[in-house]
Swiss-Prot record:
Identification of the protein by name: Undecaprenyl-diphosphatase 1
Protein family per UniProt: Belongs to the UppP family.
Species this chain originates from: Frankia casuarinae (strain DSM 45818 / CECT 9043 / HFP020203 / CcI3)
Domain of life of the source: Bacteria
Enzyme Commission numbers on file: 3.6.1.27
Sequence intervals crossing the membrane: 53-73, 100-120, 126-146, 291-311, 322-342, 351-371
Note: Bacitracin is thought to be involved in the inhibition of peptidoglycan synthesis by sequestering undecaprenyl diphosphate, thereby reducing the pool of lipid carrier available.
Amino acid sequence: MSSFSYAEAGVIGALQGATELFPVSSLGHSVLVPALIGGRWAADLDVSAPESPYLAFIVAVHVATAAALIVAFRDDWRRIITGLAVSVRDRRVTTADGRLAWLIILGTVPVGIVGLLLEHPLRTHLGRPLPAAVFLTVNGMIMLLGERLRRRSTTRGAPGPAGYRDEHTMPIPRSAPVTGRRVGTRPASGPLVAHGSAPGSGPGNHSKAVTTETALPEAEDVTLPEAETALPEAETAARHADRRLAALPRLDALLVGVAQTAALAPGISRSGVTMIAGLSRGLSHLDAARFAFLLATPVILAAGLLKLPDLLGPLGDGVRGQTLFGAIVAGVVAYVSIRFLARWFETRTATPFAVYCLVAGALCVVRFGIF
């Protein structure tokens, strides 16, 4: 096989852009959709083949998805990278952004190690329709179980991680002070407003009023930047969300990162398992989704860049035009998906996606396991 069509590239690019971020498994859909269509699609788009132009295409759409994540969270990544650089320079973590950067690195280590060791055998042995369908069903079960446990812990009033405060409280962790204007214990003239997460300039614009008496740490614990009160509302909300995430204990961030390794199996969603892991550690749906997106960015980008030689080498011959087209489609769809999901998780859960995975996975098990 020497190439695949632009139609195939456009459809799979759109699927990758959406399913990488929706908790429904991009790799699973990349296996199942061509197999369901059959014919030339099944022959051209076989992810389990050891030498295939489709692998070069998958590399390109992954890089495009990572680029969309970076663009959507551009302001956040600028602060996170700056915080990391400052912490390296000073040899200690003094800001919430710096601490969040190290938590992301910590959460990336497990999937980096496991991916380097097992990505190829997992893809070649499990990248077939029936295993992908089974894992897609398992993915739905995991998300349903996670949502049920989350509801149960919320009903019982179980506390979140130490130092973590969800979007219903002033989202400034005690463990990551920032420099600037001092905040006293005297109540403010009006209620403070804490917003949910928003990617970059961010779509999240719903707010909740809270009182300083119950939510604001004492003056000796935290300071606020002078310029923060003049920031746009969405950027202030994004900073607050990052501070909540920066309050996660290191072990919790590591556990979320370990959960991400399950996504190496086709059918298991990276964003889905990391979100459920975040919920299990006490994060809100909005913050769990935000952390999943931030954690996925370096992993997806690194996976794409490591295999870029495949695209530039013989595997990419004859498909570079289709690959560029598919990558553009994937990037646009991924960006739209990020903004949609940021709004979705402000008020909703992952249950509809879990039900979809259960139904679609079960039907595909019947299709490829029996017929």
